[in-house]
Each structure stands twice: as structure tokens, then as C-alpha cells.
Amino acid sequence: MLWIAPFAIACARLYYCAFEWERYADNPISILYIWEGGIAIYGAVIGAALGVFIHCKFIKKISVLAVLDVVSLGFMIGQMLGRWGNFFNREAHGGVTDSFLRMGLINPYTGTGAYYHPTFLYESLWNLVGFIIIHFLSKKRKYDGQVALMYVAWYGLGRAFIEGLRTDSLWWGNFRVSQVLAAASCLIAVIALIVLAFRPHDPQNLFVNKVAAKAAAEEASEETAEETKGE
């Protein structure tokens, strides 16, 4: 599934460029100049999810939802660590604040400094807490896709609030794109979790249990065949 990584990066770039089109309209080829900066995490998540769907549905012929359950936890770890890149680059921070949680930055051109909301830290910690909680709950999941829904709900909830603090948001009219997407995805995921919570679920229908049952049946069949030969 390594090919999904460049797929996610490409979608992260396209997502960013789509909402910053005025920068690229006169020279669309510059969309390829990714080293100049300009990617968005939501584009990466959407791209990775789409890549997983293609890989599972058309290549491996396995459960898309079951794989999304697994990679969702990986998403949270990746986002938790990846946000620290914003710290080292001194980017993607919030507005000026006097909060006890603040990050000091000095303008290299003027030599003046100020304290800002370290939104990278907020999101990193939010993902860490989410990973711990969802990892624990994943051991009691009742259906394929449940973990993925919890991830979407958790991340969307945090991002909807954190995005409102940032100074570098992508805008669509008067709306912060990622904030709207985060709130909408959180709401949809929560509704899905509530609806599915009231439906009966057979643990044997979990993809991992189906695979285990199939493997056990094949092993039993092989043992029976060997015993028959021995007779």
C-alpha cells in the first residue's frame, strides 16, 4: 500500500490549490511545484481514504471498511507527529494570544516578536488523546467501519474548533473550508455512530473474524485430509 502515500500527497496538493486558485490561475504548471509549499491535511486524508478504497475494492478484493479501521489509527499517529513540522517551520499557528499555552515568534525582517496560539500543539495533543481513546474502544468494536467513524468524529470535532484560531486558513467566500468540512464530517460520523449503535451486530461478521474462521476451516480440512491419507 506504499503507493497510497504519493496518492495522498497529490490530493493534499490539489485540495490546497483548488482553494488558492488565484495563485495558480496564470501559471497552472506551478501546481506541480510542491516544494514551494502548499498542501492541506484534509486533502491528504481524503486522498488516502480514496486510495484505500481503490486498493481494497479493485486490487486486493478485501473489506474497505476493515482496512479503514486499521489505517484510521495510523492517521492519528501520523497527524500527531506531522503537526510538529509546523513548529519547526514556524507556520500554521494561530493569532496573537496571552494564554499560558503560547509560542513566541520573531519576525526575521523587523526583529519584533509576539506570542501566538500554537495550534499545531493543540491538534497534536488532540490526536494523541484521540488515539488512546479510540485504540481502547477499537478492541470492543462491533462492526467494520466503526473505528473509522470514531476517527472522523473525533478529528472533525477538534479541527472545527482549532481551525477557528488559525491565521492561514483556506477560505471559500466567508467560510473556512477546513472548519466547515470538519464540522460537517463530525456531524455525519456522530449520526452514523448513533444510528448503528441501535442496530444488532454479529461479531462473526467482522472481517477479521471471517478471515480467522476461514483459516481455521482450511486448517481443519487439511488435518482431515492428512488423517484420511494416514488411514
Model-derived features with residue positions:
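A feature for loop-to-transmembrane-helix boundaries and adjacent hydrophobic helices
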Residues: 1-231
